[in-house]
Amino acid sequence: MTNIRKNHPLLKIANNSLIDLPTPPNISSLWNFGSLLGACLIIQVITGLFLAMHYTADTTTAFSSVTHICRDVSYGWMIRYLHANGASMFFLCLFIHVGRGLYYGSFTLLETWNVGIILLFSVMATAFMGYVLPWGQMSFWGATVITNLLSAIPYIGTDLVEWIWGGFSVSKATLTRFFALHFILPFIISAWVMIHLLFLHETGSNNPLGMSSNSDKIPFHPYYTTKDFLGLLLLILLLMTLALFYPDLLGDPDNYTPANPLNTPSHIKPEWYFLFAYAILRSIPNKLGGVVALILSILILMIIPFLQPNKQQTMMFRPLSQFLFWILVADLLTLTWIGGQPVEDPFISIGQTASMLYFSLMIFIMPMTCLIENKMLKW
């Protein structure tokens, strides 16, 4: 059996990636989230496939087809809620995964980090298009507001928006293309995941100490397969609790009202995982400025490796940087809260302050702190 595992052309790849992979012996539970993201992707593809069998991408029947799935399809309600709450689990794992990369300096593995950011953008695009498909009020108006942001692009903006819509407003053409793209993107994401892992296995995993562990590695199986399996069980427990006991906890009640272009909801907001970016968008009173800030709020991660002059890779032994990291986390939580609030004082000023703090921390304060820490350590 060992010979087949190590010599068979296909099994050899799986063996070198999942069984005999040399792994640092000291990686903590925060390194579990990569495998959990893989599990989330598989759950989303399987549940999504079953939903696509019963869904119709037509403005007249989309809403009722989702109702039909929940009422008439065997366990359709469960598949629908697993898919909707699976997206929330996906983003929860994504944010922790990126946060761990920032805290432990994994961004020094440049190729892996950049492919990861492409993955983050792809997953966000997929989730946005998926939110449009049930064709409720928030689906329709969310699609209208977010796609309309592209009209802020000088000269080509209006044409670009109408090209994406397939008409002069969000219509049947928009819904059909969003469904097609929402269906194909997870498979493109799967290909990017393979590239992400390919780059990661070229350099090997980082570890909490940020030091080379080449002289001291252990095989991935059975140590980390067991550890990952425990994480997977906890993820499934949380997902099942959400889907079976609190299925609509993270959703919006407005989405249970069929889309009506003549009636605007009192407060348009995206799903919780986009609220931080939405708050940054709203905090700038200029349309183009808001769109630029929105894109930069994620794209800034790409320049993080060039903004960190620290001599120690991880924040484990750098208390000042640790303090600032947790301020950044608190700031993002504040932005998430603000994104769900109406556009009125004091929420406007809190959002603007939090947005300024977010960019200041990323571009100036954290790099400057790294330099101070280097001086203190006489490096």
Curated annotation (Swiss-Prot):
GO terms for biological process: mitochondrial electron transport, ubiquinol to cytochrome c. Binds 2 heme b groups non-covalently. Pfam families: Cytochrom_B_C, Cytochrome_B. Keywords: Electron transport, Heme, Iron, Membrane, Metal-binding, Mitochondrion, Mitochondrion inner membrane, Respiratory chain, Transmembrane, Transmembrane helix, Transport, Ubiquinone. The keyword Metal-binding applies. Gene3D superfamilies: Cytochrome Bc1 Complex, Chain C. The chain crosses the membrane at residues 33-53, 77-98, 113-133, 178-198, 226-246, 288-308, 320-340, 347-367. It comes from the Eukaryota. Heme b b562 binds at residues 83, 182. GO terms for molecular function: metal ion binding; ubiquinol-cytochrome-c reductase activity. GO terms for cellular component: mitochondrial inner membrane; respiratory chain complex III. InterPro entries: Cyt_b/b6_C, Cyt_b/b6_C_sf, Cyt_b/b6_N, Cytb/b6-like_sf, Cytochrome_b, Cytochrome_b_C_euk/bac, Cytochrome_b_N_euk/bac, Di-haem_cyt_TM. It is found in: Mitochondrion inner membrane. A ubiquinone binds at residue 201. Its cofactor is heme b. It is a multi-pass membrane protein. Heme b b566 binds at residues 97, 196. Its main location: mitochondrion. Belongs to the cytochrome b family. Component of the ubiquinol-cytochrome c reductase complex (complex III or cytochrome b-c1 complex) that is part of the mitochondrial respiratory chain. The b-c1 complex mediates electron transfer from ubiquinol to cytochrome c. Contributes to the generation of a proton gradient across the mitochondrial membrane that is then used for ATP synthesis. The cytochrome bc1 complex contains 11 subunits: 3 respiratory subunits (MT-CYB, CYC1 and UQCRFS1), 2 core proteins (UQCRC1 and UQCRC2) and 6 low-molecular weight proteins (UQCRH/QCR6, UQCRB/QCR7, UQCRQ/QCR8, UQCR10/QCR9, UQCR11/QCR10 and a cleavage product of UQCRFS1). This cytochrome bc1 complex then forms a dimer. Heme 1 (or BL or b562) is low-potential and absorbs at about 562 nm, and heme 2 (or BH or b566) is high-potential and absorbs at about 566 nm. This is Cytochrome b. It comes from Lepilemur septentrionalis. The gene is MT-CYB.
